[in-house]
Design a protein with these regions (language model features):
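CN hydrolase (nitrilase-like) catalytic-core segments centered on the catalytic cysteine
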Residues: 1-80
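A sequence-level detector of short, solvent-exposed, charge-rich linear segments
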Residues: 19, 49, 60, 84-88, ...
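A short, polar/charged loop-to-alpha-helix boundary motif
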Residues: 76-95
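Cysteine/selenocysteine-centered motifs that mediate thiol-based redox chemistry or coordinate metal-sulfur cofactors
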Residues: 89-120
């Protein structure tokens, strides 16, 4: 229901705009995980300098729809807090037919049948 990622993502080159290319990819992945798994994604990224490397910060919280609820500033330390409502998970999942209509016992039974028919 909640994925927590802690990273030390260093700053790398600029993308087509004024953002670092690494920030764009990390944020896209976090949004994709949030919406694909209909989970909250909490990402805490290191900020500051160490051994000649710069870490960009930008910690965030993404909701089960893949939208940012909270986004920290880049290149600055911050203490961020965000309240999440786990009931939003049920509401979001009930709107998605793939998850709403999931039948895990059927899948388990069919996988067991396939394995029995094709032992390796």
């Amino acid at each position: 229901d909640v994925m927590i990622f802690v990273s030390s993502s260093p700053s790398r080159g600029l993308d087509s705009g004024d953002r670092l290319s690494g920030t764009r990819w990390v944020e896209l992945v976090n949004q994709a995980y949030g919406s694909m798994f209909t989970d909250y994604v909490i990402h805490c990224n290191r900020v500051g300098y160490e051994d000649g490397k710069n870490f960009w910060g930008g910690s965030s919280v993404v909701d089960p729809n893949g939208e940012f609820l909270l986004h920290g500033t880049y290149f600055e330390e911050a203490l961020l807090t965000q309240t999440i409502d786990l009931n939003d998970l049920h509401r979001t999942r009930s709107r998605l037919p793939l998850l709403r209509d999931e039948r895990p016992t059927l899948v388990q039974r069919e996988l067991a049948r396939i394995l029995m028919e094709n032992p390796s």
